[in-house]
Amino acid sequence: MILNKEKIKNYAAYLYIKVAYDQAHSKMAHTVYFTNFYRSSKPLFLDEEDPINPCFQTISMGGGYVSGEIYRSDFEINDDARCIITTQSSAKAYKTVDGKTSEQHTNITLGKNSILEYISDNVIVYEDGKFAQFNNFKMDSSATLIYTECFGPGWSPHGSAYQYEKMYLNTKIYYDDKLVLFDNLKFQPRKNDESAFGIMDGYHYCGTMIVINQQVIEDDVIKIRDLVKEKYPDMDMIFGVSRMDIPGLGLRVLANTYYHVEKINAVAHDYFRRKLFNKKPLILRKP
């Protein structure tokens, strides 16, 4: 539910989206609320063969995160509802001038038999920037989640990467109230050599995809590996695919451009849209 006004005041911007299945009219009803720099597009319908699956583009009007600002998003996908949520463009965290860390908190709830495709663009942290992202998912075991994220260093006048102070990504997924995934990535290039073997292996961008659905099996892990190798045999990147303890898998990509990460994630996304929904690849039509 929407935060009360007093709690909303604690955030530089707040965004709330709720999607519910309207059985009487066979469509998805939605509620959108936002403050300050946050906006959301009206529901877009990207697939003419799937006219009741809305897509919401989240928009940050301020241009980026300024040091010390805290943003919050709450998304609720009710029982039997489905939607696509995506960012309009990459998020940018700029130089901190007072040592404070910019933060993004996102809380997502998925009800019974709900479906969420949450496709976020990359987070770019610029020189001297400090940024932390906290994602908390609470989902029913009958729900479906497809989620992507990526981060990388921003432009530096020195022409070198890893000039930011801190990048922290914290993702938790609760499955029937049980914590099944705790992904904790912390990068502090001024304290550690982030380009070293075993960390980023010399690459600049790190991308992640999570797919959770009752139909995901071990054979899907093998198929995703084979599809990526077959489609991009010469791409300069490293990737890995692992099955989770629940019906789901994780895909991690290290590459030198967000474009390459996006391409690898798209291979898996297209595969699961066909297998799980019998739908064609998703085209977000971003400028």
UniProtKB/Swiss-Prot annotation:
<comment type="subunit">
    <text>UreD, UreF and UreG form a complex that acts as a GTP-hydrolysis-dependent molecular chaperone, activating the urease apoprotein by helping to assemble the nickel containing metallocenter of UreC. The UreE protein probably delivers the nickel.</text>
</comment>
<dbReference type="InterPro" id="IPR002669">
    <property type="entry name" value="UreD"/>
</dbReference>
<keyword id="KW-0143">Chaperone</keyword>
<comment type="similarity">
    <text>Belongs to the UreD family.</text>
</comment>
<dbReference type="GO" id="GO:0005737">
    <property type="term" value="C:cytoplasm"/>
</dbReference>
<dbReference type="GO" id="GO:0016151">
    <property type="term" value="F:nickel cation binding"/>
</dbReference>
<protein>
    <recommendedName>
        <fullName>Urease accessory protein UreD</fullName>
    </recommendedName>
</protein>
<keyword id="KW-0963">Cytoplasm</keyword>
<keyword id="KW-0996">Nickel insertion</keyword>
<dbReference type="Pfam" id="PF01774">
    <property type="entry name" value="UreD"/>
</dbReference>
<comment type="function">
    <text>Required for maturation of urease via the functional incorporation of the urease nickel metallocenter.</text>
</comment>
